[in-house]
């Protein structure tokens, strides 16, 4: 069985084809970074228009990559939310239209469930139950996962997401959009301990996060110091260490609270090398395992949507005939699959 996956929730157009026996057959991705760089962030209208231009050509490219035709596709999965409403509507409309034209089922997929399941595209996959850290530009959440659709929110950011804090702090340091990955690269040249940032909300019980204060702390630190390359690198190092430590402390609490021995990291920030090294160390101390997707499958992509669509379709999920998207869609509202 083969599923075509369509991802258009924000500023990446991702198309992939997943086979339940052969695995990932095609993975096409177009990023709009250059389009939005001059604005310092994603412009929703521009994002939607670019998805319109790129989605169908990428579908054609994916079919060519997999050496398949439309007749070889058994279902079409598309991101139905959460995300930018205009961008979501592009992918959902094209996905639903293709499914109708090809006479195959259309499967609406939750974007964050796609991220959560992305590590299952790797050879080493997690068994249930596990704690999931979903960490990206729009979300920072800790989830208890006991099966597909069996998600319990343990904690989340009460303000900025971790990825958003990375990008905003990078902008304060004068780095180009999107600055998060550039900040992380700069942090590698920083001196540990020259600056010490707080670890927000780690001095109290609970599993919620807060990262907006780190951005303010960074702004004050930048203003009070010289603008040399080394100082900027030292500030980047201090900021990254604070975010990573905060995430690690909360993950450890979640694992101890649930008693689970497996941690799944997903979302764009999960590609961060410092975060991966920190979590690997913690899981070794706890006698557990950490799982994550390869870096290119941590950011938005069609492969995770194709896989999630495959799993949901096998569990009996099929979308309505109309086109429906949900810009806001709590993960906990997803139905559980009867067969895990």
From Swiss-Prot:
Task: Report the enzyme's class at the first EC level.
Answer: transferase
* Pfam families the UniProt entry points to: TsaD
Indicate which residues the UniProt annotation says bind Fe cation: 111, 115, 300
Indicate whether Nuclease appears among the record's keywords: no
> Does the record carry Nuclease as a key word?
no
Enzyme Commission no: 2.3.1.234
**Location (main, coarse):** cytoplasm
Alphabetical keyword list: Acyltransferase, Cytoplasm, Iron, Metal-binding, Transferase, tRNA processing
- Give GO BP annotations, semicolon-separated: tRNA threonylcarbamoyladenosine modification
Q: Provide the cofactor list for this protein.
A: Fe(2+)
Residues bound to substrate: 134-138, 167, 180, 272
One GO cellular component from the entry? cytoplasm
- What is the protein's known function? Required for the formation of a threonylcarbamoyl group on adenosine at position 37 (t(6)A37) in tRNAs that read codons beginning with adenine. Is involved in the transfer of the threonylcarbamoyl moiety of threonylcarbamoyl-AMP (TC-AMP) to the N6 group of A37, together with TsaE and TsaB. TsaD likely plays a direct catalytic role in this reaction.
Please state what the protein is called.
Answer: tRNA N6-adenosine threonylcarbamoyltransferase
Look up and give the organism this protein is from: Proteus mirabilis (strain HI4320)
């Amino acid at each position: 069985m083969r599923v075509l996956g369509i991802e258009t929730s924000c500023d990446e157009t991702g198309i992939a084809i997943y086979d339940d026996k052969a695995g990932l057959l095609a993975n096409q991705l177009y990023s709009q970074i250059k389009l939005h760089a001059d604005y310092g962030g994603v412009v929703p209208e521009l994002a939607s228009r670019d998805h319109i231009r790129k989605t169908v050509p990428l579908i054609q490219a994916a079919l060519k990559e997999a050496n398949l035709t439309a007749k070889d596709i058994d279902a079409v999965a598309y991101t139905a939310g959460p995300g930018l409403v205009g961008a979501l509507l592009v992918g959902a409309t094209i996905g639903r239209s293709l499914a109708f034209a090809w006479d195959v089922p259309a499967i609406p997929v939750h974007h964050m469930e796609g991220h959560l399941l992305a590590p299952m595209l790797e050879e080493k996959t997690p068994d249930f139950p596990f704690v999931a850290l979903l960490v990206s530009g729009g979300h920072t959440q800790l989830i208890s996962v006991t099966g597909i659709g069996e998600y319990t929110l343990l904690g989340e950011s009460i303000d900025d997401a971790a990825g958003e804090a990375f990008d905003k702090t990078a902008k304060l340091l004068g780095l180009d959009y999107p600055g998060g990955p550039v900040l992380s690269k700069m942090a590698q040249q920083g001196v540990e301990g020259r600056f010490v940032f707080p670890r927000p909300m780690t001095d109290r019980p609970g599993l919620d996060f807060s990262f907006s204060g780190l951005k303010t702390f960074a702004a004050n630190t930048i203003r009070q110091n010289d603008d040399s390359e080394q100082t900027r690198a030292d500030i980047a190092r201090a900021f990254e260490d604070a975010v990573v430590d905060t995430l690690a402390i909360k993950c450890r609490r979640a694992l101890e609270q649930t008693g689970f021995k497996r941690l799944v990291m997903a979302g764009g920030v999960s590609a961060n090398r410092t975060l991966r090294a920190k979590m690997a160390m913690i899981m070794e101390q706890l006698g557990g395992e950490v799982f994550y997707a390869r870096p290119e499958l941590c950011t938005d992509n069609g492969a995770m949507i194709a896989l999630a669509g495959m799993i949901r379709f096998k569990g009996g999920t099929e979308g309505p005939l109309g086109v429906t998207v949900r810009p806001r869609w709590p993960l906990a509202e997803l139905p559980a699959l009867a067969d895990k």
